[in-house]
Amino acid sequence: MPYTLEDLKAHGLSPAEYQQIQQQLGRDPNPNELAMFGVMWSEHCCYKNSRPLLKNFPTTGERVVVGPGENAGVVDLGEGDWLAFKIESHNHPSAVEPFQGAATGVGGILRDIFTLGARPIALLNSLRFGPLTDPRNRRLMARVVEGIAHYGNCVGVPTVGGEVAVDPCYSGNPLVNVMALGLLETPAVVKSAARGVGNPVLYVGATTGRDGIRGASFASAELKEDAQQDRPAVQVGDPFLGKCLIEACLEAFATGAVVAAQDMGAAGITCSTAEMAAKGGVGIRFDLDRVPARESGMAAWEYLLSESQERMLLVVQKGREAEVMEIFHRWGLQASVAGEVIAEPLVEIWHQGSCVVQVPVRALAEDTPVYVRPVLPEPPAYVQAAWQWDPATLPPCDCQGIHLAQATLAWKEVLLQLLASPTLASKAWIYRQYDHQVQNNTVLWPGQGDAAVIRIRSQRFGVGEVPPLRASRKAIAATLDGNGRWVYLDPYEGAKAAVAEAARNLTCVGADPLAVTDNLNFGNPENPVVYWQLALACRGIGDACRALGTPVTGGNVSLYNETLTPQGSQAIYPTPVIGMVGLIPDLKCICGQGWQQEGDLIYLLGSQALTSLGGSEYLAVIHQQVTGRPAPVDLELEKRVQAACRHGIRQGWVRSAHDCSEGGLAVALAEACLSGGRGATLSLAPGSLRWDQALFGEGSSRILVSVDPAQRSAWEAYLEAQLAGQWQLLGEVGSPADPLLLRTAEEDPLLVVSLAAMQAAYHGAFSD
């Protein structure tokens, strides 16, 4: 073997994988070919550890136009409108260069959308950081937010929603997941399969440099404590060039001359040529000397592994290349004929007049390693210990508060502490840095509803024309949801809960949930405990998606989210993030989360009994414990609760709707007060529950709604038929001067807290 073990390790390959390469080639690979195998056989590109588990996901449905395998999923919204959507991660790059790591994460996911022929219309993000009391974490968070805002604002795509959570497990390894949505402009989806022997392959976009080299391999290994040395693996983005690329590509696609398109993301030219050829069952001959370079003296392997941003490969009809290139030149972009489609299924790379790579397409893109690892037959020790936890071990509590050893902590103080915790606190400081109204289609923006709502406007209009409003007044809703702590304590139920919460958030704004894109953020799959977490989480996602009728159209897997330190390896919580889109039939029937009118009746849909303190924010913040077992998800009840909420919204009975999730019922009530600027008076009976569980216990299948009192009879008759007693009337909405007043059924006070006090706590965690 001409390579040492250190050589293989540098490329992320094992000795066994090198033997596979030798067998497939019938020889040793040359250094350029080895570099290509290193990135194409990385977890980031070939999903060698997760691919068998992803087969558990449902991927087809009545509205699915494009499922997994293309640059993004596509669903049919009716009336000729198709929606493309996808989520991606940029975790490792954001850890070492947070501004560019986050910014290029936005640029990359936008390319996945417009590569299909869709105009990007919205962005969302899901972020995880370590405690903000650590200056490093706070700086990292600020730079990530700045990077997201920079690219999204400059490229002209609104950032309309997302989520942020804070936990010590993310200190060394933050998570930056970005989701994008787009509406198809082309009559058909632009696919990535190269076709037509002799058709030219065009390189378009920005020039190629040395930034981002081996970025895919970097994303497929644990972060080292001295991760700053990996900064060259982080790409550098240009949103203004990205905007030009969007317009040029959509204009080129409209000519009908483009046969296939693929963005140059992870693994750059290597991945684009191999995947386009593999999907088309053809080969590609490519000449690196025709690639516009921004640096001199680049070696072949540097061209092949560069992940310079804002670049695309196009296969165009022979004879029409000049027509397409003129479009890109007019937009100030590079465009050159750098290759051609060939019949023999090979990736053939030329450099300085010599053939430097000749590899079977299947070896790079299809016959990659797949590892089916054994799944632990029973939960690991940490989970079994957590499940033995009993709430009775907590200090006693009553209607006055929790009686800690040093003093009684009143429920008002508990609520204020929870509202001030970074995971629950207002994220206004973050989302105010994002332009969430550019394009003028955002109907519900951050802080107004449980999901973002975007108006659908025609995307098929000429330059300089104003897009017409649709007579049908349809809209799209989108959300991102995840709870790493729940998945850590129960991967199966925690993953189910993430899917259920995403659907519930869409329901709360009046949308029918349609489909899912998922981002699986986990640790090292070679660790049996991590693989068990991953396997059970995938099973939970699959089961929940089947039950709720939300097929998975694609997604992203981000493994090795661990930090290697002298003390060992620190892994993140297993954190699947669910991106879900929904359809609102009529914009007249949407709902925000805040109270609307004084005197409206407040109802809780769902069962208080299906809650738990296990894994709750209350347990973590007040008692500094991460233990217990999260509440199981009753998917049948979930469907009925969501159906009841949507029906109430569309009948005009329900005036506000808000999901009860992190922080439990009391926090949901406070959020509805703060969002609507009104107090409320309510009565609560704990039943057999402890008071802290009744107030702050967490679970699925619960929605808080306010209802027009004139519709009480019709609403309650419908609820009883639909939910059979699994609902309760809690109280009524007050005025802007009223506090949040919670009492027992016997009229004893539980908590009284003013809007001003709640606002002060809620808006204090994130600020300059």
UniProtKB/Swiss-Prot annotation:
Its EC number is 6.3.5.3. ATP binds at residues 47, 86, 518, 555. The keyword ATP-binding applies. Pfam families: AIRS, AIRS_C, FGAR-AT_linker. GO terms for cellular component: cytoplasm. It comes from the Bacteria. Keywords: ATP-binding, Cytoplasm, Ligase, Magnesium, Metal-binding, Nucleotide-binding, Purine biosynthesis. Mg(2+) 2 binds at residues 112, 263. Pathway: Purine metabolism; IMP biosynthesis via de novo pathway; 5-amino-1-(5-phospho-D-ribosyl)imidazole from N(2)-formyl-N(1)-(5-phospho-D-ribosyl)glycinamide: step 1/2. InterPro entries: PRibForGlyAmidine_synth_PurL, PurL_linker, PurM-like_C_dom, PurM-like_C_sf, PurM-like_N, PurM-like_N_sf. Its main location: cytoplasm. Gene3D superfamilies: PurM-like C-terminal domain, PurM-like, N-terminal domain. It catalyses: N(2)-formyl-N(1)-(5-phospho-beta-D-ribosyl)glycinamide + L-glutamine + ATP + H2O = 2-formamido-N(1)-(5-O-phospho-beta-D-ribosyl)acetamidine + L-glutamate + ADP + phosphate + H(+). Disulfide bonds: none annotated. GO terms for biological process: 'de novo' IMP biosynthetic process. One of its GO terms (molecular function) is magnesium ion binding. The active site is at 44, 90 (proton acceptor). It is found in: Cytoplasm. The keyword Transport does not apply. Mg(2+) 1 binds at residues 88, 556. Substrate binds at residues 89-92, 111, 235, 307-309, 558. Part of the phosphoribosylformylglycinamidine synthase complex involved in the purines biosynthetic pathway. Catalyzes the ATP-dependent conversion of formylglycinamide ribonucleotide (FGAR) and glutamine to yield formylglycinamidine ribonucleotide (FGAM) and glutamate. The FGAM synthase complex is composed of three subunits. PurQ produces an ammonia molecule by converting glutamine to glutamate. PurL transfers the ammonia molecule to FGAR to form FGAM in an ATP-dependent manner. Monomer. Part of the FGAM synthase complex composed of 1 PurL, 1 PurQ and 2 PurS subunits. Belongs to the FGAMS family. NCBIfam families: FGAM_synth_II, PRK01213.1. This is Phosphoribosylformylglycinamidine synthase subunit PurL. It comes from Synechococcus sp. (strain JA-2-3B'a(2-13)) (Cyanobacteria bacterium Yellowstone B-Prime). The gene is purL.
